Amino acid sequence: MRISGTMASLAGLEQAIEEQDEEQKELAIRRMLLLHGITLSIGGIPLLYLGEEWGTLNDYDFTKDPAKAGDSRWIHRPRMRWEYLEELDDHIESGSGSIGQRVFKSIRQLINLRKSLPALAGQEMDLVATSNDHVLGYIRIYEGHRLIVFANFSEHPQVIDGNKLR
């Protein structure tokens, strides 16, 4: 079985929008930003796939093309929709706006944070045992700078034992 889809749809945003569920929209956005935060902090060269910067949903148009209909990977290979960028340009600084604008601004903040933290400049990354199945922990160290990251993959607050982190 192959799992295909855009990050936003796989994170639950598409379903939350269809169901007009504000709480689930918020959780989906938080899941997306968690994944982007990890991508930008864990090491290596981060990659944003087409449309992730504003939360593009699955594109089902591929099912209309017989040459593509049998390949579910086309669901996350949308045509570029330039009107999304125009909407971002019009409203990005206003503080209000769409889900796409919020995601875009948040990713921009994460990128700026990555640039400002010297510990993220190097390539060294060590996992931290959190003793909690919901929490991923890792440490980044570079030229005397140190950063520890904890990522909670649950929708609920989690506890880790600080004594085990020494």
Which residues make up each language-model segment?
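Active-site and adjacent substrate-binding regions of carbohydrate-active enzymes
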Residues: 1-166
